[in-house]
Each structure stands twice: as structure tokens, then as C-alpha cells.
């Protein structure tokens, strides 16, 4: 419930959908930041664990053109989101944009290509969910979902993003990397401990 209080929604005019995983009986609705209590914010609760389950629930509930994923320690760069959305608006054949994320203190979070490139099964293995923007209708039409056997919260805690992108490519969907920063994410994050003892 403390993590819900730390959520920082984007400042722009975005529709917000919050899915909270709560396999216990924790109270969290009273912890929502004021920005998430508005009429454009929709909340849902899953009584299960596993990030792939929550991401699939978000896809299922989403009624917007595009969807960007986040967790409690992500801060979005509104100008970057707008630029990526403008690209998607101009390129209706693209189902997924993979963009960049920065650290709050150390520049880009990892090495990225310096220019736009089409996603393949060979160049997508290091994707992070908070770098992805999906075209909801295409993802739903192609039946692409996160493999719930992978991702934080289950035994195979890595690989869910890569499988999602590979499944999209296999289904004939197009993904593109854009050198645009859309989010900041700390080096030590809420997901850093998954898979460690």
C-alpha cells in the first residue's frame, strides 16, 4: 500500500489506469495520490502475483489508442511520450514503440541505438516494459499478451518483455525503436530484488 502512495502520474492530459496486485488484504485505495482520484483514473485490483498478470489485465481493461506501462517508481517525460504518440499517430502500421529510459542521476539507463530501427527477435532482448508503448487495438486483434510464466513475481522472473515482442513479430506485428526518452527509472528499483535471495 505504501507503493501506491508513491505513484507519480504524468502531468499531461492522459487517461490513467491503475491495476494494484494485492494478494493479501492490504488497504490501498486511501493511499492513492490525488492525481489518481480524478475522473480519468480507473483502478482495478488483482488478488494475485506476477507482473505479467497485471500487464495482461491492463491490456484487457484499456480502451485507449495507446498504452504505456509503469510501476510505482517510474516518472514519465511528458514531451517524450507526446513525441512517441505523434510517431504512432503518423505510422498506423506500428504496433509497438520501444523507447528510452533515463536514470534520475546518471543519464540513459543502458546503451541504446542512436537512431530509429525496426525491432527484430535479435535486437529486442533487453527491452523493459516501461520503455514500451503499444497500440492497444493491434495488440488485442493479434491476441498478444505477456506470458504469465515469466516476469517478476514468478520463478522465471526475466524474459516477459522479450517474449511479448517476439510473439508480436511472429504474429506479423511491427515494432520500432525510437531514440526518445519517455521515462526515468532509478537504478535501484522496486523490481531489483526479484530473483535474488
How would you label these PLM feature ranges?
Residues 67:
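Short aromatic/hydrophobic "clamp" motif used to bind/position activated sugar donors
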Residues 71-75:
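The conserved acidic donor/metal-binding loop of glycosyltransferases
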Residues 79-112:
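Conserved donor NDP-sugar-binding/catalytic core segment of glycosyltransferases
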Residues 4-44:
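Acidic donor-binding segment of Leloir-type glycosyltransferases
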Residues 152-153, 173-195:
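Active-site donor/metal-binding and catalytic loop motifs
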Residues 151-164:
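Acidic donor-binding loop at a coil-to-helix junction in glycosyltransferase catalytic cores
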Residues 63-64, 128-145:
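Conserved nucleotide-sugar donor-binding
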Residues 45-62:
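Glycine-rich, basic loop-to-helix element that forms the pyrophosphate-binding segment
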Amino acid at each position: 500500500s505504501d507503493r501506491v502512495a508513491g505513484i507519480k502520474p504524468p502531468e499531461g492530459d492522459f487517461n490513467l489506469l491503475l491495476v494494484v496486485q494485492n494478494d493479501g488484504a492490504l488497504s490501498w485505495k486511501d493511499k492513492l495520490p490525488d492525481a489518481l482520484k480524478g475522473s480519468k483514473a480507473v483502478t482495478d485490483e488483482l488478488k494475485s502475483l506476477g507482473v505479467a498478470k497485471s500487464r495482461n489485465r491492463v491490456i484487457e481493461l484499456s480502451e485507449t489508442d495507446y498504452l504505456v506501462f509503469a510501476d510505482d517508481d517510474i516518472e514519465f517525460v511528458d514531451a517524450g511520450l507526446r513525441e512517441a504518440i505523434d510517431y504512432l499517430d503518423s505510422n498506423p502500421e506500428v504496433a509497438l514503440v520501444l523507447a528510452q529510459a533515463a536514470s534520475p542521476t546518471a543519464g540513459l539507463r543502458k546503451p541504446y541505438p542512436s537512431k530509429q530501427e525496426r525491432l527484430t527477435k535479435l535486437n529486442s532482448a533487453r527491452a523493459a516494459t516501461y520503455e514500451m508503448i503499444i497500440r492497444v487495438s493491434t495488440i488485442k486483434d493479434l491476441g498478444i499478451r505477456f506470458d504469465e510464466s515469466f516476469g517478476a513475481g514468478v520463478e522465471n522472473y526475466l524474459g516477459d518483455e522479450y517474449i511479448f515482442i517476439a510473439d508480436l513479430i511472429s504474429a506479423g506485428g511491427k515494432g520500432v525503436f525510437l531514440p526518445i526518452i519517455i521515462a526515468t527509472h532509478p537504478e535501484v528499483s522496486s523490481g531489483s530484488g526479484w530473483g535474488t535471495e
